[in-house]
């Protein structure tokens, strides 16, 4: 298996969490959160990340309702994914992200209690969980 680099995005209207992962280790690391204004990110910041990490794949979390149906944020996340593809020519995959924010808060709380629960950290760890879910679904046993 080639070492593939994956960038993960947890799309939000005010903040977009970003993580980087390696397929060979099936693990990911939180990078940062990018501020967004009504879902519109700072594209220059994203361009720098794409240039720096040269991802083979970009995984964008897809916020679905618990019953699997789509909502307004699902459509906005898809639009964000499509724009990433159009602007940077990167291969895109969307990944079900139900419960990632809850799981991210639990993971951060284990590491540092309430002090660790800043919005930016939660978003970046959510992006980690999106990448890890992708790896598990595509390369797990």
UniProtKB/Swiss-Prot annotation:
GO terms for molecular function: nuclease activity. Its EC number is 3.1.-.-. GO terms for cellular component: cytoplasm. Transmembrane segments: none annotated. One of its GO terms (biological process) is rRNA 5'-end processing. Keywords: Cytoplasm, Hydrolase, Nuclease, Ribosome biogenesis. The keyword ATP-binding does not apply. InterPro entries: RNaseH-like_sf, YqgF, YqgF/RNaseH-like_dom, YqgF/RNaseH-like_dom_sf. The keyword Nuclease applies. It is found in: Cytoplasm. Belongs to the YqgF nuclease family. Could be a nuclease involved in processing of the 5'-end of pre-16S rRNA. NCBIfam families: RNAse_H_YqgF. HAMAP family: Nuclease_YqgF. This is Putative pre-16S rRNA nuclease.
């Amino acid at each position: 298996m080639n070492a593939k680099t994956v960038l993960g995005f947890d799309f939000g209207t005010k903040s977009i969490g970003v993580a980087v992962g390696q397929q060979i280790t099936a693990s990911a690391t939180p990078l940062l959160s990018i501020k967004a204004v009504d879902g519109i990110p700072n594209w220059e910041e994203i361009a720098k990340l794409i240039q720096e990490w040269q991802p083979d794949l970009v995984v964008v979390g897809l916020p679905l309702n618990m019953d699997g149906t789509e909502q307004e944020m699902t459509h906005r996340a898809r639009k964000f994914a499509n724009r990433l593809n159009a602007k940077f020519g990167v291969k895109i995959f969307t990944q079900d992200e139900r419960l990632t924010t809850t799981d991210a808060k639990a993971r951060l709380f284990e590491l540092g209690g309430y002090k660790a629960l800043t919005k930016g950290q939660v978003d970046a760890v959510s992006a980690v969980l999106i990448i890890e879910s992708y790896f598990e679904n595509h390369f797990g046993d």
